Amino acid sequence: MDQPLRRHGARFDGRTAVVTGAASGIGAATAARLAEEGAAVVLVDLAEERGEVVAERIGEDGGRARFVTADVAVEEDWARVVAAAHSYGPVDVLVSNAFTVDVTPAHEMSLPSWQRQLDVNLTGSFLGFRAALPDLRDRRGAVVLTSSVHAHKGIPGHPAYAASKGALLSLCAQLAVEYGPEVRVNAVVPGPILTAAWDRVTPEDRERSVAETAVRRFGSPEEVAAAIAFLSADEASYITGTSLVVDGGWSVVKASA
């Protein structure tokens, strides 16, 4: 097999990474970035067809990747994910990126919808961390949780999503302290990133979101993937328990408004 084109180096040679929510968007870009830098990557998602396509594309580019259909909110599914990772080696990097969102105001949101969002967005990260923890401790690995600017700023229609993303930042701090000598745990906080989710947004709302950034454009999944790769790499060996905001200055503009 041809070696992947190393545009960004080989920081993850000999390492194994698990990326959830990897069938599209930030997760797919992160899986590709880690594989490009030498990691063997296990992609996890419920979207089997799209996930297989992403894994195949990584392989065609010379990387090592396999896809596992799994629900991050189901504890038993994590045994299969870790077993798949072990076909490459112990887990060195865990990127907990899977999410679901229901844009509905609190007074109209059903309890099952609320619970499902917390199960995927928050509990899924806890279950993944716990399943991979023996490897992560042994390998002195790194974990990156994908939060959101919704954790910091109230945006109508996102009560469960915001609650779960805010809780992820607290979980990040807790895990970093509890397992600090052995495992680094950080979070990324993306802002307006141009993924398929924006296909459902009106042109007017898209323009307003761009205008609310300091750089006056959407971010790309690849830009978030670059931040995740940095936090996962040895260059970030003295960084843990914190979050890296990747929002093009959206938070600053909001604070100044």
Residue ranges and their predicted role:
Residues 2-8, 153, 229, 240-257:
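Short C-terminal tail/terminal secondary-structure segment
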Residues 3, 187-188, 208-239, 246-248:
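C-terminal helical subdomain
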Residues 105-106, 110-118, 198, 209:
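Substrate-binding pocket helix/loop in short-chain dehydrogenase/reductase
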Residues 107, 153-159, 216, 234:
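Active-site loop immediately N-terminal to the catalytic Tyr-X3-Lys motif
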Residues 129, 164, 172:
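Active-site helix of classical SDR
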Residues 134, 176-181, 237:
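Alpha-helical segment proximal to the catalytic Tyr-Lys
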Residues 148:
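Residue(s) in the substrate-gating loop at a strand-loop-helix junction
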